């Protein structure tokens, strides 16, 4: 997307932070306006994360203006809000390629730019990384500064407080910017707090504060009284006592859309010693009315025309697997008030909006705290309740210890509805659901199911709901289901039993999951037998034995890492049965899968019908 200089006269002079820092401070408000306008048009053409970036425009300008990036380290938590950062760090003309195959990465990415000092995608990691860089900077003694930017949502994660507790103890110089976009800030409160922040971060206040500490070192009783008095006085006007208790000097809250106030406050804070936290108030979706009114709905958008003030109407399609899950959850909750739905801050994405509205007392949003969400489910199961933990595959990784220690070890009947299993597409390697079958297979007492369509998904969810001998997992992909007519009656499936979907000869394909349609298409060309295995664990032992004894080659197909996945389970079983035979494993390779459209990625990995057939024919040569 080339830049029309007539529409962006200041932005045209700020293609890099070095150029930005040459501009007079007086033009920064205009730069912010132009940057917001450019972001609006570029995301409209490319699709992508939208509302978060609109809310961090002034912050991004101020950070790169005050800090000498990339020498000074700037770390963005999660990265949804980093589009303005990408625009100002030499990637402006490539923004139209973001999240597309071969285009720039959806999140800050070390391989992409020296300004992206830490690759991100999951929340709550920035302060730990920043602390490490601050320790390294102190050892280096080159005057390097370190800044972490984290949103208020990520502050619900336990890792954040672990890092802050450690930072307060080590006391290295670092700044944490808390971007609080839960509410807009009124003009009066904004003016008051902007003034207080500049006063409290200024040289006069901090000199008195530090000098007083030195004077009182030998008088611990008076020192403690003075500390409590300071905290009390600050607590009367600012909500920072909690951060002070963790060892941080708290400044704020200030208006995160006042670029001049941000610059002045950061200039003051740049020279403060020890860990600092700057609390700013922003509005998600700032500058675009529909996104301001509905920041969740405009969090990520398809391609759209900003001038219409609405997203394009979605084309009629089959329901998504997330919607299938959400409807199933409502169906069982209508008949059983012991059913509880748990999500770690993914209500919309997991299809739980209707459930949360209809059954508010049975709905629990654990916030961005996957470990807590899993153990919350374990506790409910201990009391005879029926917890369903709806979680993305990539985020279940964060609750793996709890899955083992708190759920499986105690054989607790917790049902895991695992969304985004397999290729998720545009969000890239931090979000692909590549590993869940592999890491769950190793856990004793687990029952793992992979549906081939939405009806199997409903039946498997019901199977997990009925199963009381231990934890169960139903793993399904992102996106639309296959369009199978819904079977209303739900019946529990026999545990560990698959189905023959096509009878052939010589080659038997064991399918795990929603690639079944492609597998059946490939099988037609070579007259292969196709089995819908349904259960990854326990495997259908009798079916595997039968197929192995009547065919020359077994082929396993899964949208999961080959290493340790369902195919590995088949190989292990054959070894136990002392029934060795050729097995071709088809799945995700031993690499992190890059971003792009899901269909493009599956084709590139040869996991579409043509690719599956090609791999089998190559093996048979």
Curated annotation (Swiss-Prot):
Which annotated residues bind Mg(2+)?
Answer: 152, 181
Q: Which Pfam families match?
A: DXP_synthase_N (PF13292), Transket_pyr (PF02779), Transketolase_C (PF02780)
State the needed cofactors, names only.
Answer: Mg(2+); thiamine diphosphate
Coiled-coil zones: none
Give the UniProt entry's GO cellular component terms. Answer: cytosol
Q: In which pathway does it act?
A: Metabolic intermediate biosynthesis; 1-deoxy-D-xylulose 5-phosphate biosynthesis; 1-deoxy-D-xylulose 5-phosphate from D-glyceraldehyde 3-phosphate and pyruvate: step 1/1
Q: For this protein, what reaction is catalysed?
A: D-glyceraldehyde 3-phosphate + pyruvate + H(+) = 1-deoxy-D-xylulose 5-phosphate + CO2
CDD domains xrefs: TPP_DXS, TPP_PYR_DXS_TK_like
Q: What class of enzyme is it?
A: transferase
List its EC numbers: 2.2.1.7
GO biological process assignments? 1-deoxy-D-xylulose 5-phosphate biosynthetic process; isopentenyl diphosphate biosynthetic process, methylerythritol 4-phosphate pathway; terpenoid biosynthetic process; thiamine biosynthetic process
GO molecular function term, any single one: magnesium ion binding
Q: What does the Swiss-Prot or TrEMBL cofactor note state?
A: Binds 1 Mg(2+) ion per subunit. Binds 1 thiamine pyrophosphate per subunit.
Annotated family: Belongs to the transketolase family. DXPS subfamily.
Spell out the HAMAP family in the cross-references. Answer: DXP_synth (MF_00315)
Q: Give the function comment from the record.
A: Catalyzes the acyloin condensation reaction between C atoms 2 and 3 of pyruvate and glyceraldehyde 3-phosphate to yield 1-deoxy-D-xylulose-5-phosphate (DXP).
How is the quaternary structure described?
Answer: Homodimer.
Q: Which NCBIfam families match?
A: dxs, PRK05444.2-2
What name does this protein carry?
Answer: 1-deoxy-D-xylulose-5-phosphate synthase
Give the organism the record lists. Shewanella sediminis (strain HAW-EB3)
Q: What is the lineage of its organism?
A: Bacteria, Pseudomonadati, Pseudomonadota, Gammaproteobacteria, Alteromonadales
Q: Which gene encodes it?
A: dxs
């Amino acid at each position: 997307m080339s830049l029309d200089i007539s529409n962006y006269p200041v932005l045209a002079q700020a293609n890099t932070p070095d150029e930005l820092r040459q501009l007079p401070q007086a033009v920064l408000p205009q730069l912010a306006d132009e940057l917001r306008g450019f972001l609006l048009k570029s995301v409209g053409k490319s699709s992508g994360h939208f509302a978060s970036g609109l809310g961090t425009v002034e912050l991004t300008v101020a950070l790169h203006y005050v800090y000498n990036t990339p020498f000074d380290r700037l770390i963005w938590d999660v990265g949804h809000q980093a589009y303005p950062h990408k625009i100002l760090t030499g990637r402006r003309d490539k923004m139209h390629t973001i999240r597309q195959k071969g285009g720039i990465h959806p999140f800050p990415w070390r391989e992409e730019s020296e300004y992206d000092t830490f690759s991100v995608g999951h929340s709550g990691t920035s302060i730990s990384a920043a602390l490490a860089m601050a320790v390294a900077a102190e050892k280096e003694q080159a005057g390097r500064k370190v800044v972490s930017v984290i949103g208020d949502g990520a502050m619900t994660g336990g890792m954040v407080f672990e890092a802050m507790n450690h930072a307060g103890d080590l006391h290295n110089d670092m700044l944490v910017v808390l971007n609080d976009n839960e509410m807009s800030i009124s003009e009066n409160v904004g003016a008051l707090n902007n003034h207080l922040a500049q006063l409290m971060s200024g040289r006069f206040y901090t000199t008195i504060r530090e000098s007083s500490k030195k004077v009182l070192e030998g008088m611990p009783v008076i020192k403690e009284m003075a500390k409590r008095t300071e905290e009390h006085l600050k607590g009367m006007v600012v909500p920072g006592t909690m951060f002070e208790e963790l060892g941080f000097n708290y400044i704020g809250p200030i208006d995160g859309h006042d670029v001049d106030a941000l610059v002045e406050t950061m200039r003051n804070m740049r020279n403060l010693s020890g860990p600092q936290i700057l609390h700013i108030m922003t509005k998600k979706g700032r500058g675009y009315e529909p996104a301001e009114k509905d920041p969740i709905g405009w969090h990520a958008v398809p391609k759209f025309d900003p001038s219409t003030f609405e997203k394009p109407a979605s084309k009629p399609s089959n329901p998504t697997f997330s919607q299938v899950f959400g409807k199933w959850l409502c169906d069982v909750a209508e008949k059983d008030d012991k059913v509880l739905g748990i999500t770690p801050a993914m209500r919309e994405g997991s299809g739980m909006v209707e459930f949360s509205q209809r059954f508010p007392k049975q709905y629990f949003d654990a916030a961005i705290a996957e470990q807590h969400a899993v153990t919350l489910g374990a506790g409910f199961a201990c009391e005879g309740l029926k917890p369903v933990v709806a979680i993305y595959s990539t985020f279940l990784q964060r609750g793996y210890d709890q899955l083992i220690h708190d759920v499986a070890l105690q054989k607790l009947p917790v049902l895991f509805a695992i969304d985004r299993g397999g290729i998720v597409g545009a969000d890239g390697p931090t979000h692909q659901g590549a590993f869940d079958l592999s890491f769950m297979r190793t856990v004793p007492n687990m029952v793992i199911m992979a549906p081939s369509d939405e009806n199997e998904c409903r039946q498997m969810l019901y199977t997990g709901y009925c199963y009381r001998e231990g934890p169960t997992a139903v793993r399904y992909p992102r996106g639309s289901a296959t369009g199978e007519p819904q079977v209303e009656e739900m019946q529990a499936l026999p545990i560990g039993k698959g189905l023959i979907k096509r009878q052939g000869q010589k080659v038997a394909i064991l399918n795990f999951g929603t690639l079944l349609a492609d597998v059946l298409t490939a099988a037609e060309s070579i007259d292969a037998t196709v089995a819908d295995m349904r259960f990854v664990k326990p495997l259908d032992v009798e079916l595997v034995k039968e197929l192995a004894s009547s065919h020359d080659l077994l082929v396993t197909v899964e949208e999961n890492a080959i290493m340790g996945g369902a195919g590995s389970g088949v190989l292990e079983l054959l070894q136990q049965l002392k029934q060795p035979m050729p097995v071709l494993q088809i799945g995700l390779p031993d690499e992190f899968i890059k971003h792009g459209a899901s269909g493009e990625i599956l084709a590139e990995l040869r996991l579409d019908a043509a690719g599956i057939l090609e791999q089998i024919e190559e093996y048979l040569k």
